[in-house]
Design a protein with these regions (language model features):
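Short, compositionally biased P/S/T/A/G/V-rich stretches that sit at domain boundaries
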Residues: 258-266, 307, 416-436
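Short, acidic/polar
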Residues: 34-47, 195-207, 270-282, 376-390
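Immunoglobulin-like IPT/TIG beta-sandwich domains and homologous Ig-like subdomains
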Residues: 443-513
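Secretory targeting and sorting signals
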Residues: 1-18
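Beta-strand/beta-sandwich contexts
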Residues: 423-449, 521-525
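Substrate-binding cleft of secreted/luminal carbohydrate-active enzymes
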Residues: 36, 47-67, 215, 286-424
């Protein structure tokens, strides 16, 4: 696998370069936004201080409703606002929506749309034609959406602050509710209304949030990386919304984050081959939109595993054991996340879609790692380093679920934010090539200015352990070969030797700051 990803190994001879200031190589985070500019400025500034340049928020549900469930405060001349706004037309269905945005006058597009304020609450009523297009229904039948908002908006504030800080923000898209019979699938019984409402959402964002910091939109509806036909309903949601983005926000991109579940004993487990096909299916929904697929690595939920082949017989750690029970990595999981990401890189090849990684920044909860009141717990820096190296060189960008609370909570450990500030210079080895001339190209992060230790077995069965000075440091390796631009490279010159076929070799890097990688790295000849 390494040889496929590192085909540009000749770049190991690039002139030595100065190392960039260390920052942790996670460059984006899911967050909970605020309507307060000050709160958002503090949060995004903290994220930027540890290398983040991107933030993502979740979407909200477009919920079917009845007249009796319309907010009581939404009245027109004392009458239910949905009923009053629909006077003189037939109503197909009612819906409610709330995403902590103000909506109001900028969202009004058609003559029957209305907005009103009751105290600090702003209501916006949209009448969406059940038939036809535009503002009018040939049958005079409409769907009524009542939006509840306030005097300020999370999305507008985050767009503003992201722009000021030179960062990128992905706003969460509306999502359908789940079905009542199959509760993990979206309810597509109102997909036409959902499509129209997505269009109105995008038009509203274009009017109030047309700033450089708004990079695009996040698909709130989630699915596993399964190629089963049952998940076609989720793909349909992606198709609907990507087509609307292409239509109304063509200069902005989209982001989706499916998840790996490689637990051997789980009935819904997904093989590497299925993941390759599934990510291709998601890519095929892009409809011309610049789409990134940020796959969750599963380490925070116990659904995925970070281990090398040389570790397959080792016991799972205490956090994974809380989910899958005692056993070995190779026994409890079908394959390591490294194999999944390599396959998914093949799956998106030629589609124009980017493969990202969503590194889960928490761990399964035990009594030893509480994190506020979350159902997940704090993780360790070394565990995250292991997750990072397992991603290899395939993801174009690494983001993380999620900033709050997992990077900010105190518990057994200090907040991860503080730990990242003090340990961001730890080497992380993501991949390598062992060349026939005895040179070993090592890629990763924080690799400059030190030594490389390589343990290997040659073609004659002789075992070697050699430490050499790291040479040919290339701070822009990732940029030069068109992969993750944060990736660096160094070379270990071992002299004339060979690598035994099928034999594991091991690499450690101690950088110029005297810091050694804290996660085992191995590969096979």
């Amino acid at each position: 696998m390494a040889a496929v990803i590192l085909v540009f190994g000749v770049l190991h001879a690039s002139p030595a370069q100065a190392a960039p200031t260390p920052v942790y190589p996670i460059s984006g985070y899911f967050i909970y936004g605020s309507t307060s500019d000050a709160n958002n400025l503090k949060k995004l500034t903290d994220i930027k201080s540890v290398g983040g340049d991107t933030v993502i928020t979740f979407g909200s549900l477009l919920k079917p409703a009845t007249l009796s469930t319309i907010p009581a405060g939404c009245t027109i001349s004392g009458a239910n606002c949905a009923k009053a706004a629909a006077a003189g037309v037939s109503v197909n269905r009612y819906f409610t929506y709330s995403d902590n945005s103000s909506w109001g006058s900028p969202a009004l597009l058609c003559g029957r749309d209305k907005t009103l304020t009751n105290g600090t609450t702003r209501y916006t009523i949209l009448l969406l034609p059940s038939e036809g297009s535009g503002c009018s229904s040939p049958s005079n039948t409409y769907d009524v959406v009542v939006i509840t908002g306030g005097q300020s908006s999370i999305s507008i504030s985050l767009g503003k602050i992201a722009t000021e800080l030179g960062m990128k923000y992905y706003a969460g898209l509306p999502a359908p509710v789940k079905r009542t019979d199959i509760t993990y699938l979206p309810d597509l019984s109102y997909q036409a209304t959902f499509s129209l409402f997505t269009a109105r959402f995008l038009l509203y964002q274009d009017k109030v949030n047309d700033v450089p910091g708004l990079a695009g939109f996040y698909h709130h509806t989630e699915m596993p990386l399964s190629n089963g036909a049952v998940w076609d309903a989720v793909l349909k949601v992606y198709e609907i919304q990507n087509s609307r983005i292409a239509q109304y926000q063509p200069t902005r991109s989209a982001l989706v984050s499916p998840y790996i579940d490689s637990r051997s004993a789980f009935s819904g487990k997904v093989t590497v081959d299925q993941a390759r096909e599934a990510v291709r299916n998601i890519a095929d929904t892009a409809d011309g939109v610049d789409l990134a697929i940020a796959v969750q690595d599963g380490m925070g939920t116990g659904k995925g595993a970070a281990f090398f082949g040389s570790e397959s017989g080792n016991s799972v750690d205490q956090y994974a054991a809380a989910i899958v029970g005692s056993g070995t990595w190779g026994g409890k999981y079908l394959a390591p996340s490294r194999d999944y990401f390599a396959a998914m890189a093949e799956g998106v090849e030629g589609t124009g879609v980017e493969l990202w990684a969503n590194l889960e920044g928490m761990a399964p909860a035990t009594s030893q790692n509480p994190c506020d009141n979350s159902l997940r717990g704090q993780t360790t820096k070394s565990r995250m380093d292991k997750q990072l190296q397992q991603l290899g060189n395939t993801p174009r960008k690494v983001i993380s679920f999620m900033w709050d609370p997992y990077f900010t909570c105190s518990g057994t450990y200090a907040p991860m934010l503080e730990r990242l500030k003090t340990t961001s210079n730890t080497p992380v080895i993501t991949d390598s090539i062992f060349y026939g001339n005895g040179d070993v190209l090592v890629t990763g992060h924080n690799l400059s200015g030190g030594t490389i230790q390589v343990k290997w077995t040659d073609a004659y069965g002789r075992v070697f352990d050699k430490t050499v000075t790291a040479t040919s440091y290339n701070a822009t390796y990732g940029k030069q070969v068109g992969i993750n631009p944060l990736l660096e490279s160094v070379t270990a010159k071992l002299g004339s030797t060979s690598l035994g076929s099928g034999k594991n070799y091991f690499i450690n890097v101690t950088n110029g700051s005297g810091v050694k990688n804290d996660a085992l790295y191995s590969d096979r000849g």
